[in-house]
């Protein structure tokens, strides 16, 4: 099968799965509307965003540490579902928020990396959630 044929088959499978299991917002769990990509419009407006003036922190041996959202309420619940509930499909939504935060803060990262899970935790969870985020952001 050609590459284009593979893409068509994969696209068909994705659309079919979306019919059976519609994509949901990782924060409020509402079914996404056709025009919404990864995060619903309501959550995009109401997520507890860290103000730009507080996003970028510096430390003694670290050039910068940034965060797009406060870790509370729906954000906290969403991250816990991602980390412990096997909802690895949330990774692209989180990666998009992280990349936006990097760009907003003028950080030109050459590489995104992570500390891998131990073998024991990897077996328990079935996937390395931090590794997925790093993988989604490698195109930074």
Feature map (PLM): residue ranges:
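Glycine-rich phosphate/pyrophosphate-handling loop used in enzymes and phosphotransfer proteins
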Residues: 1-140
